[in-house]
């Protein structure tokens, strides 16, 4: 496959892991994750608000593991995002799924989700503050390689992952799954490789937005791969989506 030659080793693994046609939801597939995966909640404070992110890793080596940070859908840090983190840990990564809203808050309806997500779209720098706060927690873990960090995100999280790629220069790669593409931030660097996995039938990502994104990436000379999957709608990686 030509696209695989364009990707870093980290992105290749993430491509197979999260773009495969897996019919089981991670939170319902504990048998697919080995018993050697350890999980824990990591709590910290950002500007007076408590956050409760989720880490997963295998304690099977003295060598620090490359890190993958997971930005959840707009529902918050649900079992789906935690399940993805556990699967990544099973693959040999140190995974951190980010609590984006604080206090581990989750919602189950679009109205509440929209209210929580809206500030990050209106003021994108808010997302950078939350991301940096979560990223700093990695330093607490000697088994995590702070110099090798990649980011993946789903839907809302995919949009925020792309924002991090536009603003960060030290990330090893960013993958967006069915996320919005244009969020008001222009690339400040072109050092981070990007993989976008988009559903061709996703009504939330129109052709005009795709064209604008590609133009922005090309103008900034960003190294990116855009996969547009036929007959795929929004949230196509989540079997529990409706």
Describe these PLM feature segments.
Residues 24-35, 41-141, 238-242:
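Serine-hydrolase catalytic machinery in alpha/beta-hydrolase-like enzymes
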Residues 196-198:
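Short beta-strand/loop motif that positions the catalytic acidic residue
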Residues 220-242:
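C-terminal catalytic histidine-bearing segment of alpha/beta-hydrolase fold enzymes
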Residues 84, 206-216, 226-229:
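Short alpha-helix in the alpha/beta-hydrolase fold that links the catalytic acid
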Residues 20-22:
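Bacterial signal peptide processing site
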Residues 201-205, 234:
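Acidic catalytic loop of the alpha/beta-hydrolase fold
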């Amino acid at each position: 496959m030509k696209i695989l030659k364009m990707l870093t080793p980290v992105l290749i693994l993430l491509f197979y892991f999260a773009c495969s046609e897996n019919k089981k939801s991670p939170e319902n597939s504990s048998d697919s994750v080995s018993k050697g995966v350890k999980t824990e909640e990591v709590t910290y404070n950002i500007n007076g608000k408590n956050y409760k992110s989720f880490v997963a890793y295998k304690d099977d080596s003295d060598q620090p593991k490359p890190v993958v940070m997971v930005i959840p859908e707009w529902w918050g840090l649900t079992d789906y995002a935690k399940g993805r983190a556990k699967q990544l840990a099973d693959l040999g990564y140190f995974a951190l799924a980010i609590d984006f809203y604080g206090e581990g808050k989750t919602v189950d309806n679009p109205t509440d989700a929209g209210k929580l997500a809206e500030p990050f779209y209106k003021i994108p720098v808010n997302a950078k503050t939350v991301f940096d706060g979560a990223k700093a927690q990695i330093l607490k873990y000697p088994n995590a390689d702070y110099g090798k960090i990649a980011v993946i995100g789903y839907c809302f999280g995919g949009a925020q992952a792309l924002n991090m790629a536009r603003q960060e220069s030290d990330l090893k790669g960013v993958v967006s799954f069915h996320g919005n593409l244009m969020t008001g931030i222009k690339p400040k660097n072109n050092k981070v490789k990007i993989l976008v996995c988009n559903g061709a039938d996703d009504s939330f990502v129109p052709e005009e937005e795709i064209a604008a994104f590609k133009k922005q990436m090309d103008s900034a000379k960003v190294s990116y791969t855009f996969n547009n999957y036929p007959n795929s709608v929004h949230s196509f990686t989540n079997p529990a989506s409706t």
